[in-house]
Design a protein with these regions (language model features):
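Residues in well-ordered beta-strands of folded domains
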Residues: 23, 164, 177, 221-223
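Surface beta-loop-beta hairpin patches that serve as ligand-binding interfaces in beta-rich domains
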Residues: 171-173, 180-226
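Glycine- and acidic/polar-rich repeat regions and solenoidal domains
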Residues: 1-172
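Short amphipathic alpha-helical segments
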Residues: 158, 177-178
């Protein structure tokens, strides 16, 4: 929704959510998503199709207000090949950002299956507006040529995270196999002991209850086990 402050979506299993996974609308402050697992979300097609991550400045009818200091970190997203609603390939999903100030996108895994596609449509791309670090993408990821995707070199494109059971329907399927490149490859989120400073305090535990340190590199994704 819009006009929210310090709303945190964490430790959720989101599965077959028609509209998609992350949605942050306008006039939001210190809101975000961390330590969630998204499986086959965003099957809605048409004018308001589903998205993987959606940041918007929509704040009501005929009202646009940018959001500030929001975050998306340590989530695991699995996109299947086929949309079982219409039996077409899952090729409509986007990471779609409109105007917002300071959105922090760290340590997420996005797995795009064989026939699916993910488009990066970052319309406010600059270091002031967004910080993309230590994210891992695998599969057909297309960058919209009209809006260049500026990101830290730590972002890993075309890297298989090696899930325990890719395509499964349970959270345990998205733990990491031994030898996964996602182990100890994340960005350290620290800088504050205030648990309500979600951008500089990582909350201390992952989706599965494993400890997340403030001084050693975490895993990429929602699983911080070993």
């Amino acid at each position: 929704d819009w006009g929210c402050e310090r709303v945190v979506m964490q430790y959720n299993l989101s599965r077959n959510n028609f509209g998609g996974f992350v949605e942050i609308l306008g006039e939001n402050e210190m809101c975000g998503y961390r330590y969630n697992i998204s499986i086959a979300d965003g099957k809605r097609t048409g004018q308001h199709h589903g998205n993987v991550f959606w940041i918007s400045d929509f704040a009501g009818e005929n009202r646009r207000v940018t959001s500030n200091n929001n975050f998306i970190y340590n989530n695991t997203v699995f996109i299947p090949s086929i949309n079982d609603v219409n039996n077409n390939p899952m090729n409509h999903l986007e990471i779609f950002f409109r105007e917002a100030d300071y959105t922090y996108v760290y340590n997420n895994i996005v797995y795009v299956s064989d026939q699916a596609k993910l488009t990066m449509d970052i319309r406010n791309d600059s270091e002031q507006f967004n910080s993309f670090r230590n994210n891992m993408y695998y599969g057909n990821v297309v960058i919209d040529s009209n809006y260049p995707y500026n990101h830290d070199p730590s972002d890993l494109l075309s890297t298989d995270p090696q899930f325990s059971n890719t395509g499964g329907n349970s959270a345990n399927d998205y733990k990491l196999k031994s030898g996964s490149p996602a182990f100890n490859s994340g960005f350290i989120i620290n800088g504050s002991t205030d648990v309500k400073n979600y951008i500089q305090n990582n909350g201390g535990r992952d989706y599965f209850g494993n400890t997340v340190s403030s001084d050693t590199k975490p895993n990429i994704g929602a699983y911080n086990g070993n």
